[in-house]
A protein has these predicted regions:
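A conserved acidic beta->alpha catalytic loop
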Residues: 1-7, 56-57
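Alpha-helical transmission elements in cytosolic ATPase-linked domains
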Residues: 4, 8-11, 36, 65
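Short, conserved SAM-binding/catalytic segment
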Residues: 12-16
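Conserved beta-strand segments of alpha/beta enzyme cores
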Residues: 18-20, 147-149
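Acceptor/aglycone-binding surface of glycosyltransferases and processive sugar-polymer synthases
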Residues: 19-50, 60-140, 156-167
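Active-site flanking residues adjacent to catalytic metal/cofactor-binding acidic residues
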Residues: 52-54
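Flexible glycine/serine/alanine-rich "lid" or loop that lines and gates the nucleotide-sugar donor pocket
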Residues: 143
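Conserved S-adenosyl-L-methionine
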Residues: 152
């Protein structure tokens, strides 16, 4: 990120034990960067981790409900968009086709879930033990077989900047 995000992460991690940051040497792509963070957490002294995009579209208030489900025994709690109001028509259509294709091919994937989720230490360790090099985390997390729950939320408009994803 070219803004002050890293400086904020450093400041927060100094004052809050539950905040940690991982600064990569260069851009490795979304899934690989997320994997690096999850691997970092799996090796650390943490009970669970929440992954959330930094674009401020996912509702941080949903994390409270995620933690509640975790405390009730869920190892993975998916943040699921109620609707795709912030997406273009093309993005909505291609997303719908993607989920249909995944179901047709037998892939287990949570509909309208991106990478906003809570994962327990146990599920993180299982995930990072996969030998995958070409990552599709939304699909891999669903394959773990641990107890799951879903928290539904309304996605917000992007706070600043533009998505680097096509369409």
């Amino acid at each position: 990120s070219k803004d002050t995000t890293w400086k904020l992460i450093e400041q927060l991690s100094e004052s809050h034990r539950c905040v940690a940051g991982l600064k990569l040497a260069h851009n490795v792509g979304h899934q690989q960067a997320l994997w690096a963070g999850l691997d970092f957490v799996a090796a650390g002294d943490y009970d669970a981790a929440v992954s959330i995009d930094a674009d401020l579209q996912d509702d941080v208030n949903a994390i409270v409900e995620m933690v509640d489900y975790y405390n009730q025994g869920a190892d993975v709690v998916f943040g699921v968009r109620r609707e795709r109001k912030t997406d273009t028509f093309f993005k909505k259509y291609t997303a719908q086709m993607f989920y249909k294709l995944m179901r047709t091919m037998g892939g287990e994937i949570v509909y309208n879930h991106a990478d906003f989720r809570l994962m327990s230490k146990r599920s993180l360790k299982a995930l990072v033990s996969f030998p995958e090099r070409n990552l599709f985390l939304r699909g891999m997390v669903c394959m773990l077989g641990y107890p799951t729950a879903s928290v539904y939320y309304d996605r917000k408009e992007r706070f600043a900047g533009e998505s680097k994803y096509p369409c």
